[in-house]
Amino acid sequence: MGNQLAEGARIAAATKGAELVISDDRCDAEGGREAAEHFVRENVRIVTGFLCPDALEAALPVLAAGNIAIVASGVSEPTLTERRAPAPMAVFRLATGLDKETQATGSFLGSLWRAQAFAVIDDGTIEGRERAARVLASLKEQQLQPVFTDTYRPGLDNQNALVARLRRAGATHVYVGGERDDIAAIGASAAALNHPLTIAGGSLLDAAPGAQPLSQGTLMIAPVRPQDLSTAKPAIDALHQAAKLADAYAIIGYASAEIAADAILRADEKKQPVLDTLRTGSFETVLGTIKFDDNGIRTDNPNRLQRFDGKRFVLADK
């Protein structure tokens, strides 16, 4: 993934006429610190990348001391260093994380399921519980009450007992805070028990297919794959021209470098710090228009309602 990120950044930098310095953070703390020290020696003005929290965590103090901003390509949640900092650090995130995903989920399902008997369930993990709790809270704020909530046992080949409980409760729709394989098993059990069930989940559905296929019509609230965005065409064309694979991380790397190059150019034109440009500017990228708030979080919400068509997830009409 790191190599793909670097390929995208390299091609974008060439397109923008920007100088690029690449260092491997090895996805660990030592690698992150060494990469940051290398960037300081090279007088880098903006660092992009970071797919691993440990590497970002270790790089932060070094880059902060050098007054170097970071456009983080893949770490969506604040690191411990950031959470402890008295003021927002110079980290600007392209990945939006659980907050925006569950906000979008609550909004979409609140509209779609207003007249439906729905359930909210989770797999008992910290992340699964967090997803379910946030979605449930959002739905309750909209005066919607589930007919059933439960924690199910994950990793089973079939979920007949769970689906039987959903059927007894009268639930025809269910949000699942859990993994793709579990959601596939729930769908298969619903079909086996002849219980019509609309199933929704989050970005955990965007994983490699397991032994059981997902049920057609399964809903996913998550960002659209970068390579499927209409705005991604320039990156896809440039990557193909360079005989490189136009996959998600290559396109994210391309967008990260676009933002960095544009921010530096504008800062020089306006004779202002790069950090100010990142905090106040709006950037046209292959991921769409990107603007950051005071905490370095994207102001837009890239999560969309998608429906499984039997082969892949496609945008769903509300």
Residue ranges of predicted features:
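Extracytosolic ligand-binding ectodomains
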Residues: 1-318
